[in-house]
């Protein structure tokens, strides 16, 4: 049991929190706003929803850090539960991407008459996989190396190399996102109009979104590392972010 835990047991009895409800409200507003934007180019509702989600994410991160770092609630038993929870979350994310790959392979292996019974559709100009896609793949693999370097430095108590590894990983994540935005801006096909564009942008777009979220998580870990929060035997927040990044690499 953590010496900082004020309770007489190893379990964390969480206090009432407004963030789950506010997060769901923000996500609902964001989704409705996105639909309105797709149909009318009106951004204001989507931006309101996005602002709510960002605010709730920050506050929720803050509360969890306070509970684990300052109040001592993240005992070894609690950390086991957190690991189970993160494992199940990653499993659900794998199934999410399986759905999009399923849609892609269903459309490509059995092309319908609506697209000329050929794959890809005849009017599609494919991206060269040996240019930006290859560069971004190498960037992801390199980021896996740097986050592993940071993790080994953490377990060995080397705070300097931990921070260096996280800086490198965050930088690579930002570069990846920049390349993907450039790729989308110069693509010759749109999201709507055919199944190829829909499956391409949904699968790669959600992958890019996960890279962005992983980068945000690592920025939080970087700030906490600079503040001296992580210890060799107490750093599940870092582990969770590294696991999430491993999902992206797959």
Language-model segments: which ranges?
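Membrane-interfacial helix termini and the short, flexible loops that connect transmembrane helices
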Residues: 1-87, 91-94, 98-134, 141-167, ...
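Individual transmembrane alpha-helices with interfacial aromatic-anchor signatures
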Residues: 86, 202-206, 242, 246
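Short alpha-helical packing/oligomerization segments
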Residues: 200-217
């Amino acid at each position: 049991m953590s010496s900082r835990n004020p309770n007489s047991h190893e379990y964390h009895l969480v206090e009432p929190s407004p963030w789950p409800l506010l997060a769901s409200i923000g996500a609902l507003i964001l989704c409705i706003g996105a639909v309105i934007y797709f149909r009318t180019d009106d951004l204001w509702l989507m931006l309101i929803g996005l602002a709510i989600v960002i605010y709730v994410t920050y506050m929720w991160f803050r509360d969890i850090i306070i509970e684990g770092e300052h109040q001592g609630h993240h005992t070894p038993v609690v950390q086991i539960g957190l690991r189970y929870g993160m494992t199940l979350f990653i499993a659900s994310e794998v199934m999410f991407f399986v759905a999009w790959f399923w849609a892609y392979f269903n459309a490509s292996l059995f092309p319908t008459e609506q697209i000329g019974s050929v794959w890809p559709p005849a009017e599609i100009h494919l991206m060269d996989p040996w240019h930006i896609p290859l560069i971004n793949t190498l960037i992801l693999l390199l980021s896996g190396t740097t986050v592993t370097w940071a993790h080994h430095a953490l377990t060995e108590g080397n705070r300097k190399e931990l921070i260096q590894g996280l800086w490198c990983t965050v930088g690579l994540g930002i570069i990846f996102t920049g390349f993907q935005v450039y790729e989308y801006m110069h693509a010759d096909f749109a999201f709507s109009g055919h199944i190829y564009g829909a499956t391409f942008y949904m699968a790669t777009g959600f992958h890019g979104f996960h890279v962005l979220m992983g980068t945000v998580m690592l920025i939080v870990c970087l700030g906490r590392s600079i503040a001296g929060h992580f210890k060799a035997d107490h750093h599940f927040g870092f582990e969770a972010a590294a696991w999430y990044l491993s999902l992206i690499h797959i």
